[in-house]
Amino acid sequence: MVVMARVPRSERPDLVFEEEDLPYEEEIMRNQFSVKCWLRYIEFKQGAPKPRLNQLYERALKLLPCSYKLWYRYLKARRAQVKHRCVTDPAYEDVNNCHERAFVFMHKMPRLWLDYCQFLMDQGRVTHTRRTFDRALRALPITQHSRIWPLYLRFLRSHPLPETAVRGYRRFLKLSPESAEEYIEYLKSSDRLDEAAQRLATVVNDERFVSKAGKSNYQLWHELCDLISQNPDKVQSLNVDAIIRGGLTRFTDQLGKLWCSLADYYIRSGHFEKARDVYEEAIRTVMTVRDFTQVFDSYAQFEESMIAAKMETASELGREEEDDVDLELRLARFEQLISRRPLLLNSVLLRQNPHHVHEWHKRVALHQGRPREIINTYTEAVQTVDPFKATGKPHTLWVAFAKFYEDNGQLDDARVILEKATKVNFKQVDDLASVWCQCGELELRHENYDEALKLLRKATALPARRAEYFDGSEPVQNRVYKSLKVWSMLADLEESLGTFQSTKAVYDRILDLRIATPQIVINYAMFLEEHKYFEESFKAYERGISLFKWPNVSDIWSTYLTKFISRYGGRKLERARDLFEQALDGCPPKYAKTLYLLYAQLEEEWGLARHAMAVYDRATRAVEPAQQYDMFNIYIKRAAEIYGVTHTRGIYQKAIEVLSDEHAREMCLRFADMECKLGEIDRARAIYSFCSQICDPRTTGAFWQTWKDFEVRHGNEDTIREMLRIRRSVQATYNTQVNFMASQMLKVSGSATGTVSDLAPGQSGMDDMKLLEQRAEQLAAEAERDQPPRAQSKIFFVRSDASREELAELAQQANPEEIQLGEDEDEDEMDLEPNEVRLEQQSVPAAVFGSLKED
């Protein structure tokens, strides 16, 4: 049922509503200014025809024109109604008018402005849209402009209207200067490169600018260089040369790229000679090999392209004489550039470190065959290199400079160079000493022997003011008189060219200055010996010994004692003994062996045998533990040769007490073997018994086999039983040594059982003992497997009153002629004894073996 509402004529057209609308109408009449009531009514009428719904919105907005909710829903609904219509449809204009009416009251609402602007953009009405954006910016407070500009900029970029976009971006940058990169990118895309370069230069010079894209200042600078260098015809408002050169001083780690950009700018501008000047300036100023490589490669590519362009032009237009000359000039210039590369690279390295001696030598080698350049290079090098900052030996430059003059026959110039070198304040005395030695060698090469001696004597002359060799506060000229290098050369020359007295004076002076080495002392003594001054040579040794301590004095003592013995033999035996005692006093164990052997040899040849034995005995105590075994072997050998093998018994006993278990075991075997050869079977057996205490049957099977063979040859059943008893006792002893088992576990056990060190850091105490216990059980099982099968005999109790004669008689009855040997340790129980009492055999409890209680 349709009801016609009665309203005044002024409110026509008449409102038509249905019966279902009456409750909402009544509610509105009661609360006509309630937004919620109108929204409930509108929600109810969502399915009604669009005109009815629009009419309802209009009624509500007439009463509530400042309601944002109503306007927002109304405008959204009106836009949705025309969404699929053509933009030329008059309905679009109605919707636009609705928006305009809304902004009379809602001009401070950015959401409505954004929706309206987007709606206009969809219609394609550029001017109307632009003006609406401007109205929105004017209407809204500046704090809300950031909501409008993104859509505004998108609108500006969507149309090919660069002037409009530029004006809009300029306004936007006043609000958001940090978005300059976006504007620059737009300018590049619209080919307005001049303004883009200006903006980019402004950004680069602004230290407070922070790139939204995360670019560094250098990256922005590099973009600017690429932009202005690659577009010289479009960038007119900036001084490109000044900008790039400013970057050269600002970004010193990227000089290569900046120089190439500057040259590229001139190349694209057509100023080829200017570009070539830039390249030449660059390769003479860059400081790193990387920058040099970039500039040089770009320079070479430029020259190649110029040659290729010239050849192409000549081939198209025909060759002329001028073209040929120009082409040859370009080719010659390119070849010269390539040939200069090593020298230019060397210049770069020298600019990095002008005090690098090796690089100066390489530079001289690059000028090979050009004497004038070599002289200039050497002159520049010796003037540039500071000896206190030099890398390498600075004196080699002076020496090589003089050698160059010498090789070219200019000896006077070479002498002048070396003379100047002797006045240079080097950092090290060795440098000046090397120069003086080169002065002497120069004269020797040209057979000016007297002049060479004169120069070296001058070098070693005492200065007016004495100084210590390592006193850095004194110039090296005052310290060179203590240089062993100069004195050694002077001593060699004096030996070859001088007199005996002059040579002796030189060596004495070296010893007085306390700069001699053991070799110098030995050379001096040998020199005196060659001239038959034996006592003087011994005095030289004595002076050398007073200068040095062990171990440096070792060679002097060895040579001195050898020479003394060869000279006097046994004629001055007491003096020789005193010398040996003096040498051995304070001698480290490492060097004692040689001296003791030499001392013992002296006593054997010229002294007393008992003295020699005493020396050997002292030697066994004085040498290092690692050398004691060898020393005992020598001692035993010499004692056997001098006194006989019986005299070595005491030596063997002492060696067994002193040496380690391994060496003591070998000594015991040799000792026992000697006693066997002497027929002392009981002594040999006692030695085997003593040695068995340090021989684990599991690891020293060779010893037990040797003892077994010995008993087979020389023993009887009782001795065999005793050996087996000792073996069981020793094995039981080793089985109860926990520390030994741990070491054996580390050596012998494989990965199956693991080691104590394999336990986790948190596992300790009982876990360690469990692991050792497992290993002990495994070793016991292995020993059980290694034993031969036991005889099926029973355990008997033997009466204690049975005499030894009865036992022996029974043994003979069982086996009258043969001794039964077996591998089993318990075979001695197989023979039945008289008056035996049969006992029942039971298993031994596991607790007897002493294993730890398990958790």
UniProtKB/Swiss-Prot annotation:
UniProt keyword list: Acetylation, DNA damage, DNA repair, mRNA processing, mRNA splicing, Nucleus, Phosphoprotein, Repeat, Spliceosome, Transcription
Gene inactivation effect: Complete embryonic lethality before 13.5 dpc. Already at 3.5 dpc, the number of homozygous mutant embryos is lower than expected.
SUPFAM superfamilies: TPR-like (SSF48452)
Biased composition (Acidic residues): 820-834
GO BP annotations, alphabetical order: blastocyst development; cerebral cortex development; DNA-templated transcription; mRNA splicing, via spliceosome; transcription-coupled nucleotide-excision repair
Region (Disordered): 808-855
Residue(s) carrying N6-acetyllysine: K420
Entry annotated with the keyword Nucleus: yes
GO cellular component: nucleoplasm; nucleus; U2-type catalytic step 2 spliceosome
HAT repeat windows: 15-47, 48-80, 90-122, 124-158, 160-192, 198-230, 235-268, 270-305, 369-407, 498-530, 532-566, 571-605, 643-677, 679-713
Post-translational modification Phosphoserine, affected residues: S851
Keyword DNA repair: yes
First and last residue of the signal peptide: none
Compartments it resides in: Nucleus
Purpose of the protein: Involved in pre-mRNA splicing as component of the spliceosome. Involved in transcription-coupled repair (TCR), transcription and pre-mRNA splicing.
Self-association state and partner proteins as the record states: Associates with RNA polymerase II, the TCR-specific proteins CKN1/CSA and ERCC6/CSB, and XPA. Identified in the spliceosome C complex. Component of the XAB2 complex, a multimeric protein complex composed of XAB2, PRPF19, AQR, ZNF830, ISY1, and PPIE. Identified in a pentameric intron-binding (IB) complex composed of AQR, XAB2, ISY1, ZNF830 and PPIE that is incorporated into the spliceosome as a preassembled complex. The IB complex does not contain PRPF19.
Family: Belongs to the crooked-neck family.
Full protein name: Pre-mRNA-splicing factor SYF1
Organism encoding this protein: Mus musculus
The organism's taxonomic lineage, starting at the top: Eukaryota, Metazoa, Chordata, Craniata, Vertebrata
This protein's encoding gene: Xab2
